[in-house]
Amino acid sequence: TRHAFLGTARDVTIRGLIIEKYASPAQYGAIHPRVGNEVGTGWRIEGNAIRWNHGCGIRIADGMYIGRNYVVGNGQMGIGDIGNDVVVEDNEIAWNNYAGYAAEWEAGGAKFVKTNRLVVRRNYVHNNRGTGLWTDIDNINTIYEFNHVVDNWGPGIQHEISYDAVIRHNYLRGNGRGGDAWVWGSQILVQNSQNVEVHDNYVEVNEDYGDGIFLVYQRRGSGRYGPYITVNNWVHHNEVVFKGNAGTTGAAADFDHETLYSGNNRFNNNGYRVPRTDMNKWEWRGVRNWIGFQSQGQDVAGWALSHRDYAILTNQEEGQK
């Protein structure tokens, strides 16, 4: 059987069930509120275990609420699809893509497409074989907040060829093990998107792989709300910790570099902990050390400390309490 729940009825509630071992193909969910072009709106998916299904665990639709579910071990992906006014909160989303679908296509924790007013908050997203949380293609007015995103194979949070978003108060660590070429192992990746604010996140890069927070620009064309360009993005008041030699943070392009670097993208008031501040841990018109990054007008009011100096400062502050 492909689906546990399939249909276009409105205001359906699915609560307190174990939904497992359905033979849903890729891009289809064990919970699937659509038939052809007809969609069921206003579904509430609450307090379920959704596991071990072959394709996707939950496909979204307009007005869906997904809360307090255990979405683990699904063959392709935990949660995904198209819908407006969707809330995804307080779920555990883990160990998805056991079937080994191509992570750069559509696999891992959750992937949202063509959403408006999507809210993703307080989820524990870990050990997915792909990106942890991913908005890809014409998403706008997105909020990611208070999520705990760790140890996913791809980027932790990725906002790609999309528009206005806020990424705030998230904890990200150890993401990017399976996709560490160039910037594809970033903890937070803003890719060909505009008007994104990234603030008050804690980001930790593994000593052997991964990157911090990156803005990236490539040739990607245009979408529903305008060109897919990396402009008007503001990264501020985040703490980025590099545990070892691996990783950088900043902005990079493989096309039309000036649009990226002259496009009102800015890093302000961020703090960094690094093995040494003379290491090339920052990227802006090339890879640079801390002084070089600030010389480009980035994070002029930010701070960077070695792990040793940070420990000394922290101990001094503790002693004064």
Task: Describe the role of every protein-language-model region.
Residues 65-66:
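Serine-dependent protease modules
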